[in-house]
UniProtKB/Swiss-Prot annotation:
Species of provenance: Apis cerana
Keywords (A to Z) from UniProt: Antibiotic, Antimicrobial, Disulfide bond, Fungicide, Hemostasis impairing toxin, Protease inhibitor, Secreted, Serine protease inhibitor, Signal, Toxin
Cellular compartments per GO CC: extracellular region
Molecular function terms from GO: serine-type endopeptidase inhibitor activity
Domain TIL residues, every copy: 27-81
Function: Antifibrinolytic and antimicrobial serine protease inhibitor. Inhibits trypsin, plasmin and microbial serine proteases but not chymotrypsin, thrombin and elastase. Inhibits the plasmin-mediated degradation of fibrin to fibrin degradation products. Also binds to bacterial and fungal surfaces and exhibits antimicrobial activity against fungi as well as Gram-positive and Gram-negative bacteria.
Gene Ontology biological-process entries: defense response to bacterium; defense response to fungus; killing of cells of another organism
This protein's name: Venom serine protease inhibitor
Length: 87
């Protein structure tokens, strides 16, 4: 039984590293891969206020510098966040 647990753990660890390598190349346009980012990424909705956010080490894609997530979760230039309306 302990051997099965060890083999299962090793398989999951290797699989996680293997899958993690593919995540880097699958980021959408205007996003980059990072191994550790905050749970609440900068967004157009949060631009006017600074929310309390706990930084967790979560790998994934984040908006590149100068871009924020819009209501459709797409990274857009900061200038497009409020097009057509005032702050």
């Amino acid at each position: 039984m302990p051997r099965l647990v060890l083999v299962s753990f090793l398989f999951l660890a290797i699989f996680s590293v293997f899958i993690g390598g593919f995540a880097k190349s699958k980021c959408p346009r205007n996003e980059i891969f990072t191994r550790c980012h905050a749970a609440c990424q900068p967004s157009c909705a949060r631009l006017a206020r600074k929310p309390f956010c706990i930084k967790i080490c979560k790998p994934g894609c984040i908006c590149t510098s100068g871009y924020l997530r819009n209501k459709n979760n797409v990274c857009v230039p900061r200038s497009r966040c409020f097009s057509g309306r005032l702050l």
